[in-house]
């Protein structure tokens, strides 16, 4: 059992990010954005190895590698590309009410969910869809809405790591992981006084 507490000596990050919002009509607003990111550890020789990885860095000079080199790798939770687009529709009905519909789509490339770059803990690229339908007063005083998040029920790995003591106690590799919420559907009511 052992843990290494260390940090990268240096890293390089570069990228491009853009956001936009367009009132396409009196009733439709389109929003979107994207980010392209290039992250690389330029010097990270003292990384904690995941269970089962072959160490490749000898820091104490005794001829036996103890740690893993992550030089040249990207960082945890960093995807090369992310993008989103949303459509917000607001249409007056009757004399004082309004119907609203909001649809958004989010996409991200794959990324490592583990700080030790365990290949068992890579989140594949995914697309997430969300929607909101509402009816309310045009003045904004009240509104009722139905919300649906993660309509395609994506299982998104947000963090993971080696299970402590699993290798020494049971002699087998084991991981723990945290996932974002699956599909959720809810009702929302708003009254402003």
Regions found by a protein language model. Name each.
Residues 5-7, 72-76, 118-122, 174-178:
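Outer-membrane beta-barrel domain signature
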Residues 6-113, 190-192:
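Gram-negative outer-membrane beta-barrel transporters
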């Amino acid at each position: 059992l052992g843990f290494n507490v260390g940090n990268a000596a240096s890293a390089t990050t570069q990228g491009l990010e853009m956001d936009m919002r367009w009132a396409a009509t009196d009733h439709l607003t389109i929003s979107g954005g994207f980010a392209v990111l290039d992250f690389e550890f330029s010097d990270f020789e003292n990384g904690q190895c995941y269970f089962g990885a072959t160490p490749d860095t000898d820091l104490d000079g005794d001829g036996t590698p103890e740690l893993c080199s992550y030089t040249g790798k990207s960082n945890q939770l960093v995807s090369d590309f992310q993008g989103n687009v949303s459509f917000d529709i607001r249409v007056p009905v009757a004399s004082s009410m309004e119907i609203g519909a909001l649809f958004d789509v989010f996409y991200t490339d794959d990324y490592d969910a583990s700080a030790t770059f365990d290949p068992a803990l890579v989140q594949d690229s995914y697309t997430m869809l969300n929607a909101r339908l509402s009816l309310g007063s045009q003045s904004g005083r009240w509104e009722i809405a139905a919300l649906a998040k993660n309509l395609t029920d994506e299982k998104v790995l947000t963090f993971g790591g080696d299970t402590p003591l699993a290798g020494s106690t049971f002699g087998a590799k084991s991981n723990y992981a945290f996932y974002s919420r699956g599909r959720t559907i809810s009702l929302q009511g708003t009254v402003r006084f």
